[in-house]
């Protein structure tokens, strides 16, 4: 079930709905799977010329981990196929945006008082 306030998005794949989200643990698993830091992963998904299907599958797999822990990387590939690659990419993007909301207000945190 989708809950954008908690950072989760629904992905419909065939007759099943899956919940996607990117917690710290999910992002760590994604970094380990792709052997890249999250900043590089984000840059890669923002450039369609760099986007690989293996990365899409890994992104879907990692996004599923919080709510569907038993899903394997191959299961994630089947789910991506059933949902449609474009729909899966869009939903993963939404889940990433919820995990990394833009900072509002001040751009720098307040400095600690010296003492």
Map each language-model feature to its residues.
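Charged interaction scaffolds used for protein-protein
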Residues: 1-17, 36-51, 65-115
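Short capping micro-motif at the N-terminus of alpha-helices
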Residues: 20-22
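Short, surface-exposed, low-complexity cationic segments
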Residues: 24-41
């Amino acid at each position: 079930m989708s809950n954008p306030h908690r950072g989760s998005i629904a992905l419909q794949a065939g007759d099943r709905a899956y919940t996607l989200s990117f917690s710290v643990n999910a992002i760590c698993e994604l970094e380990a799977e792709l052997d890249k830091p999250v900043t590089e992963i984000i840059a890669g998904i923002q450039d369609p010329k760099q986007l690989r299907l293996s990365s899409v599958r890994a992104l879907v797999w990692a996004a599923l981990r919080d709510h569907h822990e038993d899903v394997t990387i191959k299961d994630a590939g089947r789910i991506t196929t059933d949902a449609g690659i474009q729909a899966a990419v869009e939903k993963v993007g939404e889940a990433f945006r919820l995990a990394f909301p833009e900072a509002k207000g001040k751009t720098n945190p307040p400095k600690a008082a010296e003492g």
